[in-house]
């Protein structure tokens, strides 16, 4: 999915320390759109508590707040090495370490908020209302589906 236009707009409109949380909230909204489209009852992510700024209890709560379906995090209490071991076992590790610029490297704030205030986050998101729905729809309409077969 091309999320770049959404990220650029958020980057231009919102406080940089809130970028990661706001971007993740919009990623979750889009993920939920596809989950509902495919009659899925929940989202599943690979987040592990405390690994990065966006994975504190407060950050996860702020991210979850936009979802109307459950979000499962089976790796939530695992340490990084346990997650790497599992990713090697299920043949996703090599893909996970491929070098490329993504939203985590291009749009990272020097000092990301680790305890986001939901009132402030929502106030920042209000600045996005002029264009964000159209940008999200474009991203949804141009998604590329890749099927991964597990053995």
What is each residue range found by the language model?
Residues 91-99:
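A short alpha-helix-loop-beta-strand transition element characteristic
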Residues 52-54, 80-84, 96, 105, ...:
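Short active-site-adjacent structural elements
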Residues 98-151:
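The feature marks non-catalytic terminal segments
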Residues 1:
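Phosphate-binding glycine-rich loops and their immediate beta-loop-alpha structural context
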Residues 4-8, 13-85, 89-90, 135-148:
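Active-site adenylate/phosphate-handling loop in enzymes that bind or generate adenylated species
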């Amino acid at each position: 999915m091309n999320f770049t236009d959404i990220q650029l707009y958020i980057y231009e409109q919102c406080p940089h320390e809130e970028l990661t949380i706001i971007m993740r909230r919009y990623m979750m909204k889009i993920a939920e759109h596809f989950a509902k489209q495919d009659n899925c009852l929940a989202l599943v992510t690979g987040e592990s508590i405390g690994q990065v700024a966006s994975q504190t209890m407060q950050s996860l709560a702020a991210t979850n707040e936009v979802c109307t379906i459950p979000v499962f995090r089976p790796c939530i209490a695992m340490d990084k090495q346990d997650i790497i071991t599992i990713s090697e076992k299920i043949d996703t590790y090599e893909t996970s370490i491929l070098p490329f610029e993504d939203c985590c490297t291009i749009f990272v704030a020097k000092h990301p908020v680790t305890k986001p205030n939901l009132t402030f986050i929502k106030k920042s998101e209000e600045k996005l209302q002029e264009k964000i729905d159209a940008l999200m729809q474009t991203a949804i309409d141009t998604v590329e589906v890749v099927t991964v077969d597990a053995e």
